[in-house]
Amino acid sequence: VRTAAYKALEGVVGPSDLERLSRLIEKESGKNIPQIQKAMRNAVLPLPKDKQYATVIPYVNKSCNPSLYYPVLAQAGNPESIAEILKGYNGNYKQEAFASLVNIDNIKMIEVLYNIAVNDKTNAQAALNRYTSLVAKSAHTSIRKYQLYRRALEIASDVKVQNRLINLLGETHTYQALMLVEKYMDNKATAEAAAEAVRTIASKNSENFGG
């Protein structure tokens, strides 16, 4: 019954309910926490991003467990929210913070996630996966996307991540990407993706490449 009651909260809350939700989550433990977090996210959702941050940060600052509020900060996703979650990542709430960092929809997360991928072996491949999604949906030029995919591919150890990066390199349609993905045709695990990327690039550049 209690879980159902918390779930029902999700759709009937507004910014004025955050105080009550904060009291609930501070007392709660276990399986009901995600429902209360979702209710908190919904409560501030109508507000602009900066206002979402300003509304929730007082509760973060006075909480004995700031990570309870990371999903709300991740939804806000402004630079201050990112900085606050990173403080937890570099402090006592590494995994809780990382789980929220990969849900932030902000182009500034590209560099943050790359640095995590370089320095945090446990979370490297998940960080690269999210990094790749953000680069793909960004407004960067094809050359810039090639550069960002290339550096990720250099440190990717998971074959699924490698193949995804190779596929996206193909979508840049650049000569530089063609030269790079050809190197992956000799590896059985990446050969199929590399061959497809080569075909994609060549089909878009047949005149330029002498086809």
Where are these regions (language model features)?
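Alpha-helical, heptad-rich or low-complexity scaffold/stalk segments
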Residues: 24, 99, 125-133, 160-167, ...
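Long beta-sheet-rich domains in secretory-pathway and surface-associated proteins
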Residues: 156-158, 175, 193
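Residue-level detector of extended alpha-helical repeat arrays and alpha-solenoid scaffolds
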Residues: 2, 33, 37, 66-69, ...
